Amino acid sequence: MPGLLGKKIGMTSVFSAEGKNLPCTVIEVGPCVVTQIKTLEKDGYEAVQLGFQEKKEKHTTQPEMGHFKKAGVAPQRHLAEFKNFETEYKLGDVITVDFLEDAGFVDVVGTSKGKGFQGVVKRHGFGGVGQTTHGQHNRARKPGSIGACSYPAKVFKGMRMGGQMGNERVTVQNLQVIKVMPEHNLLLVKGSVPGAKGSILLIEK
């Protein structure tokens, strides 16, 4: 899907035309620069690689520097590929938030907040084990049994247990576009998006 890179600024709320108070997320979108154009003949598929947020040359590796010099653009901090652009772009072209002006709804891809190692109650919504009386004292938030007896004599794959929670790629689909502010490179979408303030997002049309 065609889209742009952006940065999560934070959340606020706005009033709709009907007077409803809508929670929304403010995203800084672009400007993104075209750093590579992939073609069917050369790469086996068609896509446009976009860069977001310039960085200094001293923070750029030599292979990266060669890539950016070939495109004739300044070093970019974040890169991402998008497919199915209707417009043909050239290396060095700049795409701004105006690109999303006619999009009524967008999909947002980000990395969720990391929660560290969490138990089954927080991670999977378990209710805990039975009563907390009659001598029970240390199993209120335990997972309980994880398998059968001598048969099948193993724990099945996918058994829900405690473990690392969050810090994974999450896609939220069909978020309504509340407002596009080209003068500030800002996009307001209804609801929340994954990640902490300042995290990088992919906004897909």
Curated annotation (Swiss-Prot):
Which species is this UniProt entry from?
Parabacteroides distasonis (strain ATCC 8503 / DSM 20701 / CIP 104284 / JCM 5825 / NCTC 11152)
Q: Which InterPro entries match?
A: Ribosomal_uL3, Ribosomal_uL3_bac/org-type, Ribosomal_uL3_CS, Transl_B-barrel_sf
- Say what the protein does: One of the primary rRNA binding proteins, it binds directly near the 3'-end of the 23S rRNA, where it nucleates assembly of the 50S subunit.
- Gene Ontology molecular function, alphabetical: rRNA binding; structural constituent of ribosome
Family annotation (HAMAP family): Ribosomal_uL3_B (MF_01325_B)
Subunit text: Part of the 50S ribosomal subunit. Forms a cluster with proteins L14 and L19.
An individual GO BP term: translation
The record's GO CC annotations read: cytosolic large ribosomal subunit
Sorted keywords for this record are: Ribonucleoprotein, Ribosomal protein, RNA-binding, rRNA-binding
Gene name, per UniProt, is rplC
Which PROSITE patterns does the entry link to?
RIBOSOMAL_L3
Q: What is the lineage of its organism?
A: Bacteria, Pseudomonadati, Bacteroidota, Bacteroidia, Bacteroidales
Tell me the protein's name.
Large ribosomal subunit protein uL3
Pfam assignment, any one: Ribosomal_L3
Q: Does the keyword Manganese apply?
A: no
Q: Which family does it belong to?
A: Belongs to the universal ribosomal protein uL3 family.
